[in-house]
Amino acid sequence: MSSKSEKLEKLRKLQAARNGTSIDDYEGDESDGDRIYDEIDEKEYRARKRQELLHDDFVVDDDGVGYVDRGVEEDWREVDNSSSDEDTGNLASKDSKRKKNIKREKDHQITDMLRTQHSKSTLLAHAKKSQKKSIPIDNFDDILGEFESGEVEKPNILLPSKLRENLNSSPTSEFKSSIKRVNGNDESSHDAGISKKVKIDPDSSTDKYLEIESSPLKLQSRKLRYANDVQDLLDDVENSPVVATKRQNVLQDTLLANPPSAQSLADEEDDEDSDEDIILKRRTMRSVTTTRRVNIDSRSNPSTSPFVTAPGTPIGIKGLTPSKSLQSNTDVATLAVNVKKEDVVDPETDTFQMFWLDYCEVNNTLILFGKVKLKDDNCVSAMVQINGLCRELFFLPREGKTPTDIHEEIIPLLMDKYGLDNIRAKPQKMKYSFELPDIPSESDYLKVLLPYQTPKSSRDTIPSDLSSDTFYHVFGGNSNIFESFVIQNRIMGPCWLDIKGADFNSIRNASHCAVEVSVDKPQNITPTTTKTMPNLRCLSLSIQTLMNPKENKQEIVSITLSAYRNISLDSPIPENIKPDDLCTLVRPPQSTSFPLGLAALAKQKLPGRVRLFNNEKAMLSCFCAMLKVEDPDVIIGHRLQNVYLDVLAHRMHDLNIPTFSSIGRRLRRTWPEKFGRGNSNMNHFFISDICSGRLICDIANEMGQSLTPKCQSWDLSEMYQVTCEKEHKPLDIDYQNPQYQNDVNSMTMALQENITNCMISAEVSYRIQLLTLTKQLTNLAGNAWAQTLGGTRAGRNEYILLHEFSRNGFIVPDKEGNRSRAQKQRQNEENADAPVNSKKAKYQGGLVFEPEKGLHKNYVLVMDFNSLYPSIIQEFNICFTTVDRNKEDIDELPSVPPSEVDQGVLPRLLANLVDRRREVKKVMKTETDPHKRVQCDIRQQALKLTANSMYGCLGYVNSRFYAKPLAMLVTNKGREILMNTRQLAESMNLLVVYGDTDSVMIDTGCDNYADAIKIGLGFKRLVNERYRLLEIDIDNVFKKLLLHAKKKYAALTVNLDKNGNGTTVLEVKGLDMKRREFCPLSRDVSIHVLNTILSDKDPEEALQEVYDYLEDIRIKVETNNIRIDKYKINMKLSKDPKAYPGGKNMPAVQVALRMRKAGRVVKAGSVITFVITKQDEIDNAADTPALSVAERAHALNEVMIKSNNLIPDPQYYLEKQIFAPVERLLERIDSFNVVRLSEALGLDSKKYFRREGGNNNGEDINNLQPLETTITDVERFKDTVTLELSCPSCDKRFPFGGIVSSNYYRVSYNGLQCKHCEQLFTPLQLTSQIEHSIRAHISLYYAGWLQCDDSTCGIVTRQVSVFGKRCLNDGCTGVMRYKYSDKQLYNQLLYFDSLFDCEKNKKQELKPIYLPDDLDYPKEQLTESSIKALTEQNRELMETGRSVVQKYLNDCGRRYVDMTSIFDFMLN
């Protein structure tokens, strides 16, 4: 008994150690008098700490729980052990951080990676429910032995010191771990000779790989420190349920406990995440006819299942061996659907088919998710783990070296580095045609297949600039595993795959799928020719949130799910489709109870099922269980990616929902270690990874917006109206309002809104055919469907080129990581070069002609080149492989390749896409089945989008295939073609009124449609005769055209029906009404004005009709007789609202901040809808300062609530939203009068009087200017500033206009006198103020402020563009002009001079300072005799003042003409 009690005492110590006590407590037998701890000084403490860091696996028998000493004092009693540093955006700081945190990789077996992230409480909870199970001592001892195993016997390989040095310390890559195995641990390493045979047959087939044979690596184990104690302990506790269950959970919960080591994550985050491999095991086969049960009320933790490593490790990786199978309990929230192997696999061929939808990368293995076809033709969800994938490395030999030389040098080194027994390699001839200099166009490379799964250093990549005596460049070192798989297996997007030799027993409960298999040989996976895809299970999702003001966090109140279980993408989705199931989950908004009668009222009035929960955690647990049961392939929603998935994930994380991984198909036990702590980009990556397996179809992301270009705010109601042509008036639900907690009708109305939004989201996605189109695009590009759904056009271009060039035997460029890109940027900044990460190309783009501004009343033809840039690439055979370019100077324009050069890869790819689209369009014309016709239309759209976007990869700086010389050549040929087209039109006496990149607008001079078309067809024939592939065609026919500026016009487009009858439709491009910052009222007014101006009415009559219409609008605005929603203004935030430096003066920013404070989700990219309101009469009192426009801006929903008494500001909307855009529309119309326009809108006409007739400072060469000697001073000085004087006695300021009548001053016989205080001005006081005013105007001129002449831009700056007068604003084509020109300054000086000119004062030839209708117009006027008398009496004073002005006029260079420069030619 004493022996047994001693062993039980040891067991208690072991449990105490595992529960948080220091592991040193478990030391065997110790006397009670032994000290628990030692007292040491700081120096000794640091010394011991250094020793502990050198042996970080210091815990005895920790069963892979994950205790590692990282040098940080930790409280082991805490349950949460997922601590990590905060992420930062500074790449430089990350690099330095990595250097400090590099971990020594050891040659452990797979159990060394089995480190759980579960808390102790979770393990004990599972232990209580486990059955007693016998664990063989040998198995336990083997596992323990792996943690204490000694160093391996090292092969004594002599390697070149230079190459070894490069591999061990490469500053440009992650290849940082030491690879030396000769100088191992002195206590455990022994020199051993290794006999190796290297056989290279130069004449052998390239399909044969070279192998280097090595003797097996021997393991030499050290004695366990407490082996005897553990052995004795296990004799008695082998049947202990606690230990058995703990062992089981440690193994099973290892599966995917940490974030994946994806390449993109490696570029962003520290490399100290988990090194775990994927640990999978097949669960026991069960019948398909099982009952689906979801126990929502269960409060117990879900039971877990064990996972073991898939056995199919790559060649040469003997360290990754599978563990034995363990049984597990069934998860109560898991869908109990399991499929037998016999139901899936064809016994004759040992194959089965899977349609793959999505993927994820986990610890150097690839997992595909999709649907497997059963023998009864039904489909179930499936997961396939692919092992044995290899990275293809290409080593380029130095001159005089061969692949054999590289093999003898690099293969032993790679084997040593990655712990491999053998590596496959072979010589292979490859081509290269990209932008790296000094790379031959074709050469013999050493192709090396390096497994992604290696016993050690698996996270290290080979740097491309690695070199030695035998080679000087390496390609393919940083390729990711998904890219390698699809390129090597030639898989083009989602399709049916034939999978042979799959293992149905190696994976168990690793996912939420019905079928789980592993494949050890990637070559056993091949795409099939089957075209019909399986039906998809789609789930539409809508979430309502509430801001918790105490924690400043968004909480979830309601979730609505609508299930569509058989969505076929091979045929159009019916417009009236109804969900197969509809369910709403809701919890009380503010307390623990609902309004009385909610359940009954919801059952009566709301569609579908409504489930009530007491708290948010129970609701989210049920939501995860329903996802598990429904098992959707696609999750549809509005703003899922940017808003609601983020809120959902954070709430499940904060509430510790154990089944959170149901939102994806990968079973997870713990959250990513750094989730919620890093920046938003990393959180977005984590959420995408958690959702892997289920496609996220967000109708409001970049892809959804590209398919709905007519939307402006992309609100759900707007998208519904534009796409489905149905109205939905959204309700603004604010659950902070107590009415939703107290009023059952209000709560029911809020739930109805969520249900409506859920169903609308699905309907919009089906109408825009988002899933169908993105699938076609993905099949063309060969990338992942999820990437296309996210809207990454650059990713599609990259993959289609990767596939095409790889098939043609080319080495493709390596993907540049964020670190290397940032390093290049720093180097360029040090060299004073432009940053390389700028997405804008630094070369000339398309040619844009200066427009013939004004109204064109004749028919105008729009002649457009079909796909100009793709056609240029084909026409002139422009490709990486054909254009000879200077790779040392990328700014040098290359020449067009000769005609005898073979067709390049890129032109051939584009030609294939164009031909396929042409064939599809032919089928469309003859197809009678409407369903097939729709499918053909989608396919031709996908082909068109793919072909037209191919050029973009050449000029996109961050593109993998960026080639600036090729992009320059393409755009240069485009400019040349457009110019030649214009010259051809002018040679035919046709007027080109405008041209832009790939089209020209030609004024035919005809007022008859048939004659205009005849001219267009003749012009088309002449242009097309010049080219082989380039084609121009009539794109549009304008009956009338109003050209405002570059890229800004309005026109009446003529459309012919089947009977040949023409109808006109207004087409607008680039004008104010197309911009979201102008309200619907402004757009309605602008459309009415354009329709009136472009009509067949007389111009004078049309203008009068416009003025009358605007007067009616003014009355309606002032009397508030227009709907509130007509006043809404939309502004998109380009960054977080708190990040705007001048946010106080920006209405959208102020509204966004108030919305965030109220609990709404507002971030960069959000579109803010607001209304400018009128200041209250109480606030508008004389002693109350006027509120700014930003302070008077309110969200639309606030204005629509009548109790708020918010009224739109009539003055603001009439002046800023109506007057400004209408003036710009009419400024080119003859007889337009800006003063008349201002009067029609009730604005102050005096503000616009000086603008009548235009104010161009004499710089517009198109306007006729009268001679300076023929105009009066009133006309000449209409834009000058009045001279203001200040009384030296009372400081009263007043305008001085010479010897004239005034209410503020008088010119007496004694001089100038202030009427307010009767104080006389001395000559010095007068002249000093004159000089001060003159100097202020001179300073304004020399300030050099520039302003864009485009009224829609209006940018004001002092910076001068390197392109001269080009506007600095992105996308603006205006011209920068001086805001205060030399002519204005000269006229200002002349005006001051005229004020003191005695003769002009006598004749009263002065600019009047008052108008007759002014309120301060003087009642008494000076007589002619008194003016003359006063002038003579004050002549001395007047001449003194004039002398000051003359001094500056004499220095003004504008008043002089250099005759010598004009007539210099006559002197020669």
Swiss-Prot record:
Its EC number is 2.7.7.7. It is an enzyme of class 2 (transferase). The modification Phosphoserine is found at residues 31, 82-84, 169-170, 240, 274. The modification Phosphothreonine is found at residues 172, 309, 313. Keywords: 4Fe-4S, Acetylation, DNA replication, DNA-binding, DNA-directed DNA polymerase, Iron, Iron-sulfur, Metal-binding, Nucleotidyltransferase, Nucleus, Phosphoprotein, Transferase, Zinc, Zinc-finger. Residues 1-34, 71-135, 166-205, 256-275, 813-837 are annotated as: Disordered. A motif (CysB motif) lies at residues 1348-1372. Transmembrane segments: none annotated. InterPro entries: DNA-dir_DNA_pol_B (IPR006172), DNA-dir_DNA_pol_B_CS (IPR017964), DNA-dir_DNA_pol_B_exonuc (IPR006133), DNA-dir_DNA_pol_B_multi_dom (IPR006134), DNA/RNA_pol_sf (IPR043502), DNA_pol_a_cat_su_N (IPR024647), DNA_pol_B_thumb (IPR042087), DNA_pol_palm_dom_sf (IPR023211). Residues 1246-1381 are annotated as: DNA-binding. One of its GO terms (biological process) is DNA replication. The modification N-acetylserine is found at residue 2. GO terms for molecular function: 4 iron, 4 sulfur cluster binding; chromatin binding; DNA replication origin binding; DNA-directed DNA polymerase activity; H3-H4 histone complex chaperone activity; nucleotide binding; single-stranded DNA binding; zinc ion binding. Zn(2+) 2 binds at residues 1348, 1353, 1367, 1372. The CysA-type zinc finger is required for PCNA-binding. DNA polymerase alpha:primase is a four subunit enzyme complex, which is assembled throughout the cell cycle, and consists of the two DNA polymerase subunits A POL1 and B POL12, and the DNA primase large PRI2 and small PRI1 subunits. Subunit B POL12 binds to subunit A POL1. POL1 interacts with CDC13, POB3, SPT16 and MCM10. In eukaryotes there are five DNA polymerases: alpha, beta, gamma, delta, and epsilon which are responsible for different reactions of DNA synthesis. Present with 1050 molecules/cell in log phase SD medium. This is DNA polymerase alpha catalytic subunit A. It comes from Saccharomyces cerevisiae (strain ATCC 204508 / S288c) (Baker's yeast). The lineage of its organism: Eukaryota, Fungi, Dikarya, Ascomycota, Saccharomycotina.
